Design a protein with these regions (language model features):
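Glycine-rich, aromatic-flanked loop segments that form ligand/cofactor-binding clefts
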Residues: 133-147
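Flexible loop/turn segments at secondary-structure boundaries
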Residues: 59-62, 84, 103, 147-148, ...
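Conserved beta-strand positions
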Residues: 76, 97, 119, 187-189, ...
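Conserved, mostly hydrophobic/aromatic
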Residues: 32, 56, 78, 110, ...
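Short acidic, glycine/serine/threonine-rich loops at helix termini
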Residues: 64, 87-88, 107-109, 128-132, ...
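Active-site loop/helix belt of alpha/beta enzymes
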Residues: 144-290
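A charged N-terminal "starter" segment
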Residues: 1-136, 175-179, 183, 217, ...
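Charged (often Lys/Glu-rich) extended helix/loop segments that serve as interaction or gating elements
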Residues: 251, 257, 264-423
Length: 423
């Protein structure tokens, strides 16, 4: 069976584990920078193009700072994510704020930072006016309804999604915003998740470019930018084909020229990729602590769904490598589990793998997006550390593991003698 490549080998990882006990997520700085540069190059034809990293994917200030240094802005959807941006010096048009069901304090904070706000609903116009005020630059999120297709393939059903303005609401919303003094408008849409079809962005782009042109003519406003949002997926399985980002950029260019050629419209293109940017650069490293043989063969690890929720929540596939046994026959079938009191706490089900022994190191791939960030504390489980594998091969702890003291910190009234014994 084809295995996925790793930026480290067993001997290197054993040295890392001496410094940072498992489980932990480790991120490959070199790969993150490479992906940011490839994306920027793919859209270099568009003057003013900018990627706004989806902070929700991996809300770590060190990872965010790496992407900031590569020219990326930040896409936020919550108060805490705005706080992270401010902490690393990303403010103003370095932030897009795309939220829904938005609390007043979030809008007010976004306005204080002068972030570019992407409105999710026509009723939010009046709400924002009352809580933060209407800026001169603003964006609106479009939901076309119906089915979203690429060719004959159905990629999603936007009509069921809770996000965005209808087409009629866009026209009315732009008119209201124009009357309130908005000078520069943006258009945004997100219609598919984890899509590896190279025609996803070009298809979405044609839809948005066409609507932008219509709005420009109907309302008489400047469409300053069009945000293709996120949605580009990654190859979770070894046999999956990765998105060809250079091809994608070239196809979006073709659509841009097709729709805007012969007009004076030259909107900037924005993207809000998260998974594509950091997903393949992250790995959950865990140690085998138990082996159980009943009706099935179970391998118990020191990690659990609290460290990586996607397999339990979505049934998502994440590739597993047994370090040091990459070339061994995959002649055993295992369920890889954690210790939560939930039967779905499994990283892999009926997975062909080499023979696994207690003490083996397992690497679970593609956890650099929606991995640590979706962690939780059910069953009293603690979130793991995060480690950066730097370009020079050294490592840096970029988030310590949670402690029981952290877990119980909100019980201000409770005296727990055991905590006094823990460091």
């Amino acid at each position: 069976m084809t295995d996925k490549k790793l930026p480290f080998n067993k001997a290197q990882m054993e040295k890392i584990i001496e410094k940072f006990p498992t489980p932990f997520h480790i991120y490959d700085e070199k790969d993150i920078r490479h992906r940011a540069r490839a994306l920027r190059h793919a859209f270099s034809w568009n003057e003013g193009y900018k990627e706004y990293y989806a902070v929700k994917a991996c809300p770590n200030p060190i990872i965010m700072s790496i992407l900031r240094d590569e020219g990326c802005g930040m896409d936020c959807s919550s108060y805490a994510e705005l706080m992270l941006c401010e902490a690393i010096g990303v403010v103003g048009d370095g932030i897009t704020f795309s939220s829904n069901d938005t609390p007043a304090k979030d809008f007010e904070y976004a306005r204080r930072l002068n972030a570019t706000i992407n409105l999710d609903d026509i009723t939010h116009i009046e709400f924002l006016k009352e809580h933060g005020g209407i800026p001169e630059t603003i964006s609106c999120r479009f939901n076309p309804g119906g089915e979203f297709r690429i060719g004959t393939a159905i990629m999603g059903n936007p009509a069921d999604a809770k996000y965005g303005f209808t087409r009629e609401q866009l026209t009315e919303g732009f008119k209201q915003l124009k009357a309130l003094g908005v000078k520069h408008f943006g258009l945004h849409s997100f219609l598919s998740s984890c899509n590896t079809d190279n025609m996803y962005y070009p298809t979405l782009a044609k839809l948005l470019f066409t609507v932008a042109k219509e709005l420009h003519e109907e309302v008489g406003v400047e469409i300053a930018f069009i945000n293709l949002s996120g949605g580009i997926g990654i190859p979770y399985r070894p046999e999956d084909t990765a998105t060809d980002i250079a091809f994608v950029g070239a196809k979006v260019h073709e659509v841009y020229d097709e729709v805007f050629g012969g007009t004076d419209m030259r909107p900037r293109i924005f993207t809000e990729l998260g998974r594509y940017m950091t997903g393949p650069a992250g790995y959950l490293v865990t140690t085998v602590i138990h082996h159980k043989d009943t009706h099935k063969h179970f391998i118990g690890t020191d990690a659990c769904a609290a460290n990586l929720l996607r397999p339990a929540m979505y049934g998502a596939y994440h590739h597993v490598t047994v370090l040091g046994k990459e070339n061994a026959p995959h002649d055993h079938v295992y369920d890889i589990t954690g210790s939560l009191c939930e039967s779905n706490d499994r990283f892999a089900i009926d997975r062909p793998l080499p023979e696994i022994n207690e003490g083996d190191i397992l690497v679970i791939h593609d956890t650099g997006a929606h991995g640590f960030s979706m962690g939780y504390n059910y069953n009293g489980k603690l979130k793991s550390a995060e480690v950066l594998l730097k370009e020079d091969g050294s490592t840096q702890l970029i988030r310590r593991a949670e402690t029981n003291k952290d877990y119980f910190a909100t019980f201000d009234f409770l005296d727990m003698p055991r905590l006094k014994e823990e460091r």
